[in-house]
Amino acid sequence: MQEPPLELTIEPPLSQETFSELWNLLPENNVLSSELSSAMNELPLSEDVANWLDEAPDDASGMSAVPAPAAPAPATPAPAISWPLSSFVPSQKTYPGAYGFHLGFLQSGTAKSVTCTYSPPLNKLFCQLAKTCPVQLWVRSPPPPGTCVRAMAIYKKSEFMTEVVRRCPHHERCPDSSDGLAPPQHLIRVEGNLHAKYLDDRNTFRHSVVVPYEPPEVGSDCTTIHYNFMCNSSCMGGMNRRPIITIITLEDSNGKLLGRNSFEVRVCACPGRDRRTEEENFRKKGEPCPEPPPGSTKRALPPSTSSTPPQKKKPLDGEYFTLQIRGRERFEMFRELNEALELKDAQSGKEPGGSRAHSSHLKAKKGQSTSRHKKPMLKREGLDSD
């Protein structure tokens, strides 16, 4: 008797009956052994399930070859961006050297229209962003061939000297009209010189620009280099209102120092106004100011700028003077003026005794003058009556 064929198209694969048969094949410890492989092959499975079981070992072997992904590391907050610090602080002391190296600047006023101006008493250059700043190089004798000029910026205050001076992130990303030689993070650039080299020191991380030294042209006594400062002194993330000093050094082909000079730089929107303000503050600081007494909260007044000392008022003395006046009208005018002054002194209480005595003396004199004036009139009347 033949068994009726299984209707695989009607029963879904891995139905409840098939699952129960598989479950009964499992041992007590729920681990399949190699003896059950023949029984698994004799199970009545559909064609697609059989193909899936045949391909499963290959997929498992392929998956085992691929390393399992590592567990993701716990998320940590990203550290704040910090610029590298430099352990080397270049000297800013003036050193003329054997060639008498020193700097010079063009004379300019403090008008609002100026884009670059130099203050001799402050030794400070005020300029606008990316504007031409001519710096003159003076030497007594020509340096050897291969000499170069290096410009480097450092912070003026001691607490910031180890930080590298660089542009702010905003100006680094802004496109500028450079020749493509200068890196975007460099603050100082040289205008119109294709031989300029922008260097980043590997040890100190400081930025500098080096150009070959060129002797003065015919009819000129100095060499002029045009520098540009590509970030404002007030930019956040850059200088951040911290004053900087630009150091100009004269070096030979081997890097030996031949001369050094420096000056302070402020990059601002109105160089003339800022120079005028800082020079006025510098003059005020130079004048001696009286110190307030201890415990006093009032501000001391600035000293007077006049050269002549204030004259002290002399107290009124008790002397009397005789003044000869021609004409009675003029005499009466001076007399009233004198009486008014005496009355004012008496009311103010400066010298009450002296003023009273003086006023009584004036009244007595007035009575005498009146009597003297009337006596001749009486004599005249007597003569007329006679």
Curated annotation (Swiss-Prot):
Protein name: Cellular tumor antigen p53
Gene3D superfamilies for this protein: 2.60.40.720, 6.10.50.20, p53-like tetramerisation domain (4.10.170.10)
Site features described as Interaction with DNA, chain residue numbers: K112
N6-methyllysine found at: K363, K365, K375
InterPro entries: p53-like_TF_DNA-bd_sf (IPR008967), p53/RUNT-type_TF_DNA-bd_sf (IPR012346), p53_DNA-bd (IPR011615), p53_tetramer_sf (IPR036674), p53_tetrameristn (IPR010991), p53_transactivation_domain (IPR013872), p53_tumour_suppressor (IPR002117)
Modified residues (Symmetric dimethylarginine): R328, R330
Residue location of crosslink Glycyl lysine isopeptide (Lys-Gly) (interchain with G-Cter in ubiquitin): K284, K285, K344, K350
Presence of keyword Iron: no
Transcription activation (acidic) as annotated region, ranges: 1-44
Biased composition (Basic and acidic residues): 275-288
